[in-house]
Amino acid sequence: MRTKVKYLLIILLVTTQISCNNWMDLIPPDGLIREEYWKTKEDVESVLMAAYETFAETDHLLFVFGEIRADMVVGDNNQSRNEELISEGNIYPDNEICNWLSFYTVINYCNEVIKNAPEVMEFDRTFTEFQMQSLTAEAYYLRSLCYFYLIRIFKDVPLVLEPSETDNTDFFPTKSTDEEVLTQITNDLIQNRVFAPNGSFSNIEENKGRASKAAFEALLADIALWRFDYEKVIEHVQNIENTAQFFLLPGSVWFENYFPGNTLESIFEIQFDGDRNQRNSTYDLTRFDARRYDPSIKAIEMFSFDFARELVRGENASIRRYGEGDYIIWKYVGQAADGRTFRSGTRAYSCNWIVYRYADILLMKAEALSQLERYSEALAIINQIRTRADVLPLNLANNPVAFEDAILEERALEFAFEGKRWFDLLRMGRRNNFARKQNLIDIIIKNVPSTQKRILATRLTNPLGWYLPIYEKEIERNRNMIQNPFYNF
């Protein structure tokens, strides 16, 4: 038994001093024990920055979990075998992609900040109540965001609210239901949003890359939409609209959302900076010579000049043609919406990962309005997005299914390859007691090998198969962990 427990945050994953800009240069030094830490405001900030940095390291997983089981990307020759198996529907608990350690590492950092920050005020008289509440609010936000990803990926997961820092820690937690997790994080966000920063940092990277009040409202809107609480979605989106701080970029500069990023449309995005060796994963996932992920046939038909009139979001913006019938994802490798100017040097790995932007929350609101049968208001928002993209407005029948399909299509156009498509489809499949379950199944099996389509379609009539299994090593390690019954082969 350990007699002096090392500060677990430090010994888990922080093995390098990577930072994306000055505000993330504070990482806890290796080898500290708890009794030597949590003495100053800087100690709190450094652990919070470690949480942000570790979350940034999940960008590869956010792409994989948000895209590869859907219909907008396909694997190329160098797609990893584990990811190929998932995209083909051959999903088993021994697949390392099912390891949730990265998310729980972020959660543990956040738990440390939440638990210990108040005590630091006793040692550091310059650490004010206002500063403490602001930093802990950011920790609540990151923890809630991680849990929101976890329940959409795995459904029921352990709800760990205390840091792993003593011998009394429960290292064998049981799972909580997804609803229990959603209730917890919703309450945490509502209680702490008042303390969140509000654009008061001295640089754009912090204002867009740290959990602001608007980021709180965006996450709350997203959670409410997942729970089909449409009035709450509208309330949270309107709270953002009322700030008058965010706008849709003109179509002529739409690509600035990706280069250089941090635009007036941005609400919250993970910051990367190749100059500081804080490199994203999306460049290597999507560049042509890597041959890992390409646009699907559906994406090509949505964006290619051969099939569509998407002048703002289409060919040379979202995708780029490489010879006859060959395309790459352009958002993360291009420097302009011209299909010619590539990111180069350290800029190649500097594209941020956008978690929320204004177009996203507007379409959340449109979805909520349409489900409440407020069709004219919903249509106005859809056409606002389309007008910005220089495409013709829609006329839709006044029924929720027509609007659901139109919004799904608009979100696919606007947020292609941004890690949102799978979760959008999953939300559609769950709505109204799985009324459109077959639509989701048809989409899932579209890109799987023909020999597997019928078998997979039958298996996926069980909605538990829409979620990933718990990694087998987690089951072996934790005697209280129960596998998703869909994967009890």
Regions flagged by a language model, labelled:
Residues 39-43, 48, 52, 76-102, ...:
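Elongated scaffold/linker segments in the mid-to-C-terminal portions of large proteins
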Residues 18-19:
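C-terminal motif of bacterial Sec signal peptides marking the signal peptidase cleavage site
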